[in-house]
UniProtKB/Swiss-Prot annotation:
<feature type="active site">
    <location>
        <position position="53"/>
    </location>
</feature>
<keyword id="KW-0456">Lyase</keyword>
<comment type="similarity">
    <text>Belongs to the thioester dehydratase family. FabZ subfamily.</text>
</comment>
<dbReference type="GO" id="GO:0006633">
    <property type="term" value="P:fatty acid biosynthetic process"/>
</dbReference>
<keyword id="KW-0443">Lipid metabolism</keyword>
<keyword id="KW-0444">Lipid biosynthesis</keyword>
<dbReference type="InterPro" id="IPR013114">
    <property type="entry name" value="FabA_FabZ"/>
</dbReference>
<dbReference type="GO" id="GO:0009245">
    <property type="term" value="P:lipid A biosynthetic process"/>
</dbReference>
<dbReference type="GO" id="GO:0005737">
    <property type="term" value="C:cytoplasm"/>
</dbReference>
<dbReference type="InterPro" id="IPR010084">
    <property type="entry name" value="FabZ"/>
</dbReference>
<dbReference type="GO" id="GO:0016020">
    <property type="term" value="C:membrane"/>
</dbReference>
<keyword id="KW-0963">Cytoplasm</keyword>
<comment type="function">
    <text>Involved in unsaturated fatty acids biosynthesis. Catalyzes the dehydration of short chain beta-hydroxyacyl-ACPs and long chain saturated and unsaturated beta-hydroxyacyl-ACPs.</text>
</comment>
<keyword id="KW-0441">Lipid A biosynthesis</keyword>
<dbReference type="InterPro" id="IPR029069">
    <property type="entry name" value="HotDog_dom_sf"/>
</dbReference>
<dbReference type="Pfam" id="PF07977">
    <property type="entry name" value="FabA"/>
</dbReference>
<dbReference type="GO" id="GO:0019171">
    <property type="term" value="F:(3R)-hydroxyacyl-[acyl-carrier-protein] dehydratase activity"/>
</dbReference>
Length: 149
């Protein structure tokens, strides 16, 4: 698979199964097979989670930032394997050492930097960092597992 950067949202949907409102990646800006991937998400007030989290003080839920990081990790794995096979999915399989260091609010642009640490028998372990304006917002070790469905 020849990877042309940037990869826009419509093409990300060809790689991972997520769709609105759960697709959390807007663009892939960098990719090195079996090593790293950089993706972005533009956080906007019109996203459904902000209706209740919190109406007077909208803050992006940490679990959605973690989900976005996992989507970036899965995308790195899929691209590294040459693209998505029809019946294969990479599922979020685990998280360690998660740290939340900065709130993310509407108007922010999240930059996800993920690095493949190990890959064995269909399970990848990744170092994942989410940044806003160069500041770390969230960091974690994320595991994704490939499954045939």
């Amino acid at each position: 698979m020849d990877v042309q950067l940037p990869i826009e949202a419509k093409d990300i949907q060809k790689l991972i199964p997520h769709r609105y409102p759960f697709l959390q990646l807007d663009r892939i800006t960098a990719f090195e097979p079996m090593k790293t991937l950089t993706a972005i998400k533009n956080v906007t007030i019109n996203e459904p989670q902000f209706q209740g989290h919190f109406p007077d003080l909208p803050v992006m839920p940490g679990v959605l930032i973690i989900e976005a990081m996992a989507q970036a990790c899965g995308t790195l794995a899929i691209l590294s394997e040459g693209g998505r096979k029809e019946n294969e999915f990479f599922f979020f399989a685990g998280i360690d050492e998660a740290r939340f260091k900065r709130q993310v609010i509407p108007g922010d642009q999240l930059v996800f930097e993920v690095e493949l640490l190990t890959s064995r028998r269909g399970i990848g372990k990744f170092n994942a960092v989410a940044k806003v304006d160069g500041q770390v917002a969230v960091e974690a070790i994320i595991m994704c597992a490939k499954r045939v469905v």
